[in-house]
Amino acid sequence: VFHRNMQRDMDTQVRLAQQEATETSMSELDIYLSTLMAKTDVLFVNDEFASLLSAQPVTLSEQIHASHQMRALMDYAMFNLRYAEVPATTYRGGSAYGKLYLLHPNVYIDNLGIFDFADIADEPFVRRLNEHDEVFSWSRLDLKGAGQYLHFNRWMLDAAKTQRMALLQVRIPLAKIEAVLMSKLTPYQLTAFYLS
């Protein structure tokens, strides 16, 4: 009985310590993302998700999903690509499909080339994307030899409302987000780190 009580007390202490660490990380993440968002114009924030982020550890998933600032950052990346910090957008004409990648240089190479988003901003599917308010979804994507990424989709319905199309896509290095969550850097330093 003594050993069981001791183990229970230890488990409680560990759980409380983990909870405190999670709350601290959540605060740091929001501070960091608030700093980043302060220099942007967020067009809108949609709180609906098609599915929860699937990632380990669970606390990381919960923190990212709970952060309205993270969702705002996704909106910024998707719809307000007027800033040099967003390095590249790829587009395949005619198939209503586009990709936006926030990656380290040379991690992902797209054979379709890299284009300035401003060059395709007037394409019909981009205009429609900005005019509709549909559903966001998260999923986790593992790339062999290239690390792990959070994979973010922007979904919308087609004109006939009969099928969904993944029009834009963001991949962010999981290790970079984890580093942000655990970092003791100032928000300014975190912003510089993320944008690097």
Model-based region annotation:
Residues S25-M26, V58-I64, G113-D119, L167:
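Second-shell loop/turn segments in exported
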Residues V1-P57:
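Juxtamembrane extracytoplasmic/periplasmic/luminal helical "stalk" adjacent to the first N-terminal
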Residues D41, P87, K99, T191-F193:
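Conserved beta-strand cores of small sensory beta-sandwich domains that regulate signal transduction
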